[in-house]
């Protein structure tokens, strides 16, 4: 379950962050408008990918994914746009990923 969860979160991050980046490029950076169309399709794929998580709780999955989105956005910016996260960016991303781990893998008893 851990590997599947991580893979699905990574795929969702690529789809959502990549989709948003494509729209940004079309709107803000003067790229062709069809880039925005590809971005919208990628954002739709993100919604589908997120629904493949084993946990049935929409709120839990999306809340946990939020932490992945924070860290993934910083990585995307560094790799694709040359953005250099500072130590506070990195610390914030680590805190978010710790939150993801607590939400997704914290021990839950009956009724928790």
From Swiss-Prot:
The chain crosses the membrane at residues 6-26, 32-52, 61-81, 87-107. Its main location: membrane. It holds the Pfam family UPF0060. It is found in: Cell membrane. It is a multi-pass membrane protein. Keywords: Cell membrane, Membrane, Transmembrane, Transmembrane helix. One of its GO terms (cellular component) is plasma membrane. It comes from the Bacteria. InterPro entries: UPF0060 (IPR003844). Belongs to the UPF0060 family. This is UPF0060 membrane protein CMM_0279. The lineage of its organism: Bacteria, Bacillati, Actinomycetota, Actinomycetes, Micrococcales.
């Amino acid at each position: 379950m851990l590997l599947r969860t991580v893979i699905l979160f990574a795929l969702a991050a690529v789809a959502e962050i990549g989709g948003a980046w494509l729209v940004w490029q079309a709107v803000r950076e003067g790229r062709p408008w069809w880039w925005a169309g590809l971005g919208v399709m990628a954002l739709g794929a993100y919604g589908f990918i997120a629904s493949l998580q084993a946990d049935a709780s929409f709120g839990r999955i999306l809340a946990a994914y939020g932490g992945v989105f924070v860290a993934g956005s910083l990585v995307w910016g560094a790799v694709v746009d040359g953005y250099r996260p500072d130590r506070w960016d990195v610390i914030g991303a680590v805190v978010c990923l710790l939150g993801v781990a607590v939400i997704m893998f914290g021990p839950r008893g009956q009724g928790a």
